[in-house]
UniProtKB/Swiss-Prot annotation:
Reaction equations catalysed: pseudouridine(1915) in 23S rRNA + S-adenosyl-L-methionine = N(3)-methylpseudouridine(1915) in 23S rRNA + S-adenosyl-L-homocysteine + H(+)
Domain of life (superkingdom): Bacteria
InterPro entries in alphabetical order: Alpha/beta_knot_MTases (IPR029028), RlmH-like (IPR003742), tRNA_m1G_MTases_N (IPR029026)
Family per record: Belongs to the RNA methyltransferase RlmH family.
Protein's name in the database: Ribosomal RNA large subunit methyltransferase H
Cited PANTHER family: METHYLTRANSFERASE, RIBOSOMAL RNA LARGE SUBUNIT METHYLTRANSFERASE H
Role: Specifically methylates the pseudouridine at position 1915 (m3Psi1915) in 23S rRNA.
The entry's keywords: Cytoplasm, Methyltransferase, rRNA processing, S-adenosyl-L-methionine, Transferase
Cellular component GO terms, alphabetical: cytoplasm
CDD domains, alphabetized: RlmH-like
EC number(s) from the headed UniProt entry: 2.1.1.177
Compartment annotation: Cytoplasm
Subunit structure comment from the entry: Homodimer.
Length: 156
């Protein structure tokens, strides 16, 4: 099973790129983690945010390979602790499809992305900086994998 993070935003700080790459490197070969960056719409004082969200959503959905399970990151989504995320990861593997996780921009996700989702996941009730979410996602998914593989990374 392949996991894709499809995220709005490019040109992240070096520490974000390095943090993501560190966890990506740790994933097993049979479960690669990939990051696809979507260019954010130009936001200005008089920007049409609804139109920007629509365009970003179209680009995100176009990046999802046909047949993939789509999971959105959204505050009202399901909240999973590490053991629950590990159970989800196992469930996704048994489903036999690759997984695309959509991470919206500053205003969140387009309605079309939410409508296309098989599941919605709430990483936190907190508002998190979008660059940091990439690193948190990579670490959380790696930790969940480590639980399923009885790897010593996760300790309770």
């Amino acid at each position: 099973m392949k996991i894709q993070l499809i995220a709005v935003g490019t040109k992240m700080p070096k520490w974000v790129e390095e943090g993501f790459k560190e966890y990506k490197r740790r994933f097993p070969h049979d479960m690669p983690l990939e990051l696809i960056e979507i260019t954010a719409g130009k936001r200005g004082k008089n920007a049409d945010i609804a139109r920007i969200l629509q365009k970003e959503g179209e680009a995100m959905l176009a990046a999802v390979p046909k047949g993939n399970r789509i999971i959105t990151l959204d505050i009202p989504g399901k909240k999973w602790d590490t053991p629950q995320l590990a159970e989800q990861l196992e469930s996704w593997k048994l489903d036999g499809r690759d997984v695309s996780i959509l991470i919206g921009g500053p205003e969140g996700l387009a309605p079309a992305c939410k409508a296309a989702a098989d599941q919605s996941w709430s990483l936190s009730a907190l508002t998190l900086p979008h660059p940091l979410v990439r690193v948190i996602m990579a670490e959380s998914l790696y930790r969940a994998w480590s639980v399923t593989a009885n790897h010593p990374y996760h300790r309770e």
